[in-house]
């Protein structure tokens, strides 16, 4: 039998209903639809299985994460407890490291403090020695100055006493008590015997100095010149002293003080300047001007360091003459 005969439909029997017509395209479509449905069901089943497995895996991972987190917490807690125990025992490495650093800082500060204390102590000792030397020097200077002032004061009193003695010698004759000249009459027979008159000797007059030394000396020289020639003058009177050109009353010198300086004989003199001082008795003294006041100057002798006070009036009248050492 040929293939065409095999493929041809069999003839229907008689009296049978007619067979339906057969279309091969429709069968293929039905088969493809069934295949698609079966594949779709298979895919859905696979997806459901996959979803279930993923859910189980997620749950398992979450449990593992929680367990791992708990383990990390326990490890961290145990580490902290161990570090706390080491800290209490003093064996913690970080604690020892920081303690070593603090100890170094402490020793450094102690060393700096000791150096600062030593420096301050040396500075205080130097200041103490310096102040002590200054105090000793000031004490010695004040002592010398006090001694010089006392010597000058005593010299001044000595001069006043000598001037007073000289004044008493020059004016002694005027203070003598002269007897009263009375006429004696003859006593009558009936008159009582006269009682002698007892008179007290008048006390010597007291001298009150209201003038300066140079004015007193000038008055004494004037009185000495006017005194009577019958009474011999004492050798110590100014009349027997050798006269110098400086004692001439007609010769006067210009002397004044301005701005702490002395202007004398057309020259300026200042403090601490070396001079020669010539007095009325031809004494020539080497002196140094100690100070310049308002109306007088103080000079210090270089021989014994005693001080003398010279008034402007004495310089103007020529009782003392000042010359520079270089020009003298």
UniProtKB/Swiss-Prot annotation:
Positions carrying Phosphothreonine: 49, 244
Q: Where is the composition biased (Acidic residues)?
A: 23-37, 45-54
Q: Which residues carry this modification: N-acetylserine?
A: 2
Q: Does the keyword Oxidoreductase apply?
A: no
**Domain topic, free-text comment:** The C-terminus is involved in transcriptional repression by HDAC-independent mechanisms.
Query: Know the name of this protein?
Result: Sin3 histone deacetylase corepressor complex component SDS3
Q: Name one GO cellular component term.
A: nuclear body
Query: Which location does the Swiss-Prot or TrEMBL entry give for the cross-link Glycyl lysine isopeptide (Lys-Gly) (interchain with G-Cter in SUMO2)?
Result: 69, 178, 201
What the protein does comes down to: Regulatory protein which represses transcription and augments histone deacetylase activity of HDAC1. May have a potential role in tumor suppressor pathways through regulation of apoptosis. May function in the assembly and/or enzymatic activity of the mSin3A corepressor complex or in mediating interactions between the complex and other regulatory complexes.
> What ranges does the record give for the region Disordered, renumbered to this chain?
1-64, 226-252
**What does the similarity note say?**
Belongs to the SDS3 family.
Q: Name one Pfam family in it.
A: Sds3
**Entry GO MF terms:** histone deacetylase activity; histone deacetylase binding
Oligomeric and partner information = Homodimer. Component of the SIN3 histone deacetylase (HDAC) corepressor complex. Interacts with SIN3A. Interaction with SIN3B enhances the interaction between SIN3B and HDAC1 to form a complex. Interacts with HCFC1. Component of a mSin3A corepressor complex that contains SIN3A, SAP130, SUDS3/SAP45, ARID4B/SAP180, HDAC1 and HDAC2. Interacts with USP17L2; the interaction is direct. Interacts with FOXK2.
Q: Region Mediates interaction with USP17L2: list its residue ranges.
A: 2-170
What are the GO BP annotations of this UniProt entry?
A: apoptotic process; chromatin remodeling; negative regulation of transcription by RNA polymerase II
Give the record's PTM text.
Polyubiquitinated. 'Lys-63'-polyubiquitinated SUDS3 positively regulates histone deacetylation. Regulated through deubiquitination by USP17L2/USP17 that cleaves 'Lys-63'-linked ubiquitin chains.
Organism (species)? Bos taurus (Bovine)
**Bias regions of kind Pro residues — which residues?**
10-21
Keywords from UniProt, A to Z, are: Acetylation, Apoptosis, Chromatin regulator, Coiled coil, Isopeptide bond, Nucleus, Phosphoprotein, Repressor, Transcription, Transcription regulation, Ubl conjugation
Q: Would the keyword Cell membrane be found if you checked this record's keyword annotation?
A: no
């Amino acid at each position: 039998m040929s293939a065409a005969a095999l493929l041809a439909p069999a003839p229907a029997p008689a009296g049978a209903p007619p067979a339906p017509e057969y279309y091969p395209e429709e069968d293929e479509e039905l088969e493809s639809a069934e295949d698609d449905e079966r594949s779709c069901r298979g895919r859905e089943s696979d997806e459901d299985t996959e979803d279930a497995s993923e859910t189980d895996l997620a749950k398992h991972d979450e449990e593992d994460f929680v367990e791992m987190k708990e383990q990390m917490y326990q490890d961290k807690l145990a580490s902290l407890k161990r570090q706390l125990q080491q800290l209490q025992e003093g064996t913690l490495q970080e604690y020892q490291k920081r303690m070593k650093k603090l100890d170094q800082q402490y020793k450094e500060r102690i060393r700096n403090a000791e150096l600062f204390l030593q420096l301050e102590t040396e500075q205080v000792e130097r200041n103490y020695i310096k102040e002590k030397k200054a105090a000793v020097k000031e004490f010695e200077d004040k002592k010398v100055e006090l001694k010089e002032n006392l010597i000058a004061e005593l010299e001044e009193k000595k001069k006043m006493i000598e001037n007073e003695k000289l004044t008493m010698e020059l004016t002694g004759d005027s203070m003598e008590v002269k007897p009263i000249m009375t006429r004696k009459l003859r006593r009558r027979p009936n008159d009582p015997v006269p009682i002698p008159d007892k008179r007290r000797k008048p006390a010597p007059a007291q001298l009150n100095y209201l003038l300066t030394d140079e004015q007193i000396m000038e008055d004494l020289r004037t009185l000495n010149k006017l005194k009577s020639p019958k009474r011999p003058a004492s050798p110590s009177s100014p009349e027997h002293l050798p006269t110098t050109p400086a004692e001439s009353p007609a010769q006067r010198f210009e002397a004044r003080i301005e701005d702490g300086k002395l202007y004398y004989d057309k020259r300026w003199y200042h403090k601490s300047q070396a001079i020669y001082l010539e007095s009325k008795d031809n004494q020539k003294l080497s002196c140094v001007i100690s100070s310049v006041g308002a109306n007088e100057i103080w000079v210090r002798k270089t021989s014994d360091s005693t001080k003398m006070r010279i008034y402007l009036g004495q310089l103007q009248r020529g009782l003392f003459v000042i010359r520079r050492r270089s020009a003298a």
